Amino acid sequence: MKKLIFVSTGRCGTKRIAQILRKYLPEEFAVVHQMPFSRLANVIGNLLFYLGPSDRVKRLLYKFIISSYCREKYFICSDPLTAMLIPKDFIDSADVCLVHIERSPEAFADSFFKLSRRRINSFIAHNFIPYWQIGIWPLENCISGRIKEKYVQVAKLKNKLFAEMYSASPNYVRIEMTEIFNSDFLSNLIFKFFNYEVIIPSNELKIKAN
């Protein structure tokens, strides 16, 4: 089963990517954005950053999370909450493509902060769930006057980690968020990796998911 996995810090257009691909690809493609247990995966992935990596934990949890989607021929995931948990056998596999999406750290920080103020679930996660984000401690989101600066550092750190962890993949791609939504990148990626031709109208790339 071929798998296309987008990894990112979040706030990188991954929800919109899933919406587009779900709309224009046939049913043999399982396209997911946020999966059950991915919030738990986010916390565990961040906790492993401090405790040290465990590929066994990553493999067991990640394969459990995606198991219900593996009935289709192809699997596409854009869930940023599972981005820290990709196991080594996925990284090394020629049947897995890892697309590392980057966004300007400053734009990420601004978007992330606004989301934490706009949605109650996001506010609760960012302020009351330990290890929800690397380097950010409970309540820091709402009491620190330098929180945006810290989110800038989070973005830089996570993108560095993703490059270190996943660049060994035979199908690793690193790309800016803006390029995805201003080019034929998605169509070309689907054709190159899955050998499936899909036409995505340019106007679809201009619509924001949230």
Report each predicted region and the residues it spans:
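A general structural motif
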Residues: 1, 71-73, 93-96
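PAPS-dependent sulfotransferase catalytic core
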Residues: 1-64, 69
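A structural signal for short, well-ordered beta-strand segments and their strand-loop junctions
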Residues: 6-8, 30-33, 75-78, 97-102, ...
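Generic structural signal for helix capping and beta-alpha/helix-loop junctions
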Residues: 38-39, 108, 208
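A conditional alpha-helix N-cap/helix-loop micro-motif detector
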Residues: 55-58, 78-79, 155-156
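PAPS-dependent sulfotransferase catalytic domain
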Residues: 81-199
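C-terminal accessory extensions appended to soluble enzyme cores
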Residues: 198-210
